[in-house]
A protein has these predicted regions:
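Ser/Thr/Pro/Gly-rich low-complexity, intrinsically disordered segments
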Residues: 2-9, 13
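Short, Lys/Arg-enriched N-terminal segments with co-localized hydrophobic residues
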Residues: 11-23
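Active-site-facing substrate-recognition patch
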Residues: 22-75
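PRPP-dependent phosphoribosyltransferase catalytic core
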Residues: 23, 27-29, 152-197
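Conserved acidic residues
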Residues: 74, 136, 166
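Short Gly/Thr/Asp-enriched flexible loops that form oxyanion-binding sites at enzyme active sites
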Residues: 85-94
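Short, glycine/charge-rich flexible loops or terminal/linker lids adjacent to PRPP-binding catalytic cores
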Residues: 97-139
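Conserved G/P- and acidic residue-centered "switch" motifs that form tight phosphate/ATP-binding loops
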Residues: 143, 148
């Protein structure tokens, strides 16, 4: 018998069934927390530890697939760079297109760009001008929501190109940084929610 995936009861669980054995795993078990990095008082949540474990990676992708299973959409947009890692398998599994949102100068064709605020200064994100067609329904995927600035800028670019953002998905959320506040008009979901910063 193969493995079947079912969304768990909470936002951060995926239930795996193997034969008659029912195994519940929490995705956060795969995240290594590093205290006092990059500065004292900060707990750094290392998402790369999810990627290094085959079960952790599968749980992360299955979590994202569960978030979009009832969503009607055409395109996945992934934010540079870990949004590529998590967004591409979702697009592949569901037979959807994948569009990379990149930093300036990385896309070879004509682009549209949006500047957004960072903690110290500003950043810019770009999409190919022809990557989203008017009327297309878009799911945006990224690894982490902190302040929400990057994904807010991507959503605005999608809308500028005539697309509709129907869902935004994250593997991890740092709720203390209030990134959701910038994304209130969108349907936002996170696999893991940490209450702190």
């Amino acid at each position: 018998m193969g493995k079947e995936k079912n969304p768990g009861r909470g936002k951060n669980r995926i239930e795996l069934k193997k034969g008659t054995i029912n195994i519940m795993k929490k995705l956060e078990e795969y995240v290594i927390s590093i205290p006092d990095f990059p500065e004292p008082g900060i707990i750094f949540r290392d998402i790369t530890s999810i990627l290094q474990d085959p079960d952790g990676l599968k749980l992360a992708i299955d979590s994202l697939l569960a978030m979009v299973k009832d969503v009607d959409f055409d395109v996945v947009v992934g934010a540079e760079s870990r949004g590529f890692i998590f967004g591409t398998p979702v697009a592949y599994a569901l037979g959807k297109a994948f569009v990379p949102a990149r930093k300036p100068g990385k896309l070879p064709r004509e682009t549209v760009s949006m500047e957004y605020a960072l903690e110290y200064g500003t950043g810019t994100i770009e999409l190919h001008k022809d990557s989203i067609k008017p009327g297309q329904k878009v799911v945006i995927i990224d690894d982490l929501i902190a302040t929400g600035g990057t994904v807010e800028a991507i959503a605005k670019l999608v809308e500028e190109l005539g697309g509709e953002v129907v869902k935004i998905c994250f593997v991890m959320e740092l709720a203390g940084l209030k990134g959701r506040d910038k994304l209130q008009k969108y349907d936002v979901d996170s696999a893991i929610i940490y209450e702190g910063k």
